[in-house]
Amino acid sequence: MTQDKILILDFGSQVTQLIARRVREAHVYCELHSFDMPLDEIKAFNPKGIILSGGPNSVYESDYQADTGIFDLGIPVLGICYGMQFMAHHLGGEVQPGNQREFGYAQVKTIDSELTRGIQDGEPNTLDVWMSHGDKVSKLPDGFAVIGNTPSCPIAMMENAEKQFYGIQFHPEVTHTKQGRALLNRFVLDICGAQPGWTMPNYIEEAVAKIREQVGSDEVILGLSGGVDSSVAAALIHRAIGDQLTCVFVDHGLLRLNESKMVMDMFARNLGVKVIHVDAEGQFMAKLAGVTDPEKKRKIIGAEFIEVFDAEEKKLTNAKWLAQGTIYPDVIESAGAKTKKAHAIKSHHNVGGLPENMKLKLLEPLRDLFKDEVRELGVALGLPREMVYRHPFPGPGLGVRILGEVKKEYADLLRQADDIFIQELRNTTDENGTSWYDLTSQAFAVFLPVKSVGVMGDGRTYDYVIALRAVITSDFMTAHWAELPYSLLGKVSNRIINEVKGINRVVYDVSGKPPATIEWE
């Protein structure tokens, strides 16, 4: 099935991924590529329209130039912020540094146009938007007209109606721009004429066919962690090739309570997936003995996982493919780190950490999907919603939620405390009937390797401390601590102290990010 596509050229904005998310939310497929994507590749991609992202640079910097042949393809182009300046500069207009940076909320007065018709906030012909720019367009290219302005930016929006070129000096992709989604939908659906055929049933059908074509009769191995990405990848691949898939589930002793059983029940028993369960708790605990530095713990856990997985992989002599749960943000971030051009700077282990001499071919069926799309896919494939929508869990597991040295005793105490906290979050609702688990973005318990004095019954206790952490965030870059009801915190504390022998004090973390990080290590 062929589907209409939108191409986004990324000039380095921190929020370019949000453009892609908004387009996908309109059920139109899109891809995000570096601004220097060759013109022949753009033609081969055959987009219905092109969006030029924002970016931190100046149009006068030669290192940040897209191929201007995009303006000769006869398709609509939308320039956002820097993208608008790039469009104006290369089509004969002028761009100059602004007398003052415009950052934050602004009101744009609009003039009726194909892009803005019927879209407004409050007052007629007014848009509440989010600006973030220094340079600005000072002279329009020939054939363009102003369709929006602010007091400090006379050319805040421009259009060439004949060629369907549009420029906007604000960010429609962020939630602060109230009608941003409507503007992007107008461009994608109405101006570009893209048909909204990007749906999960269509994706499953295409992905299954692609996996079958790619793999043929070969066998595939996948490291199953119990996390969302690897679980959904396993379910999708199994839907496509059945028993040709073998999953290796490494239990390092640092999983959540009953997680090992849950994974085995779900995949091996309910879905009929071949799963090799490796109990490696002793091996991991031995390697972690005496280690207190968080980064060293992470490296040890990562190295041991690879060692255990490799040992199992060598036994599966017929496996030709290694499957991974790589998702689209991983691909984008790794591309940015390699080229130094895109907006992100971290390399993801799924994409950048494979051994150079790896003999297995790589299968990444989720690499075109964002996280929320992966969750939607998981539900469509029959995975339990409760599992698919679980809060994030770190790769090293409880190893980075036990401060200092990791011991089996500590992990067992933490597992029980964490499970009680999550149970009560799920069971307690706000006035609208929404559970506090769903109201928070991430919640967990932390084991503190310090003892405090307590009194239980007629006796004195000297036991360990548990810290509770719950945050609310939209992007995990910044976060607010969740203002949980005192009654909920009190119930969690009472249950942990009474039910988990070895804990006599519970504290709640009220630090935001920044200055604190979400995880304690």
From Swiss-Prot:
Residues 5-197 form the Glutamine amidotransferase type-1 domain. GO terms for molecular function: ATP binding; GMP synthase activity. Residues 198-390 form the GMPS ATP-PPase domain. GO terms for cellular component: cytosol. Its EC number is 6.3.5.2. ATP binds at S225, G226, G227, V228, D229, S230, S231. InterPro entries: Class_I_gatase-like, GATASE, GMP_synth_C, GMP_synth_GATase, GMP_synthase, GMPS_ATP_PPase_dom, NAD/GMP_synthase, Rossmann-like_a/b/a_fold. Keywords: ATP-binding, Glutamine amidotransferase, GMP biosynthesis, Ligase, Nucleotide-binding, Purine biosynthesis. Catalyzes the synthesis of GMP from XMP. This is GMP synthase [glutamine-hydrolyzing]. It comes from Neisseria meningitidis serogroup B (strain ATCC BAA-335 / MC58).
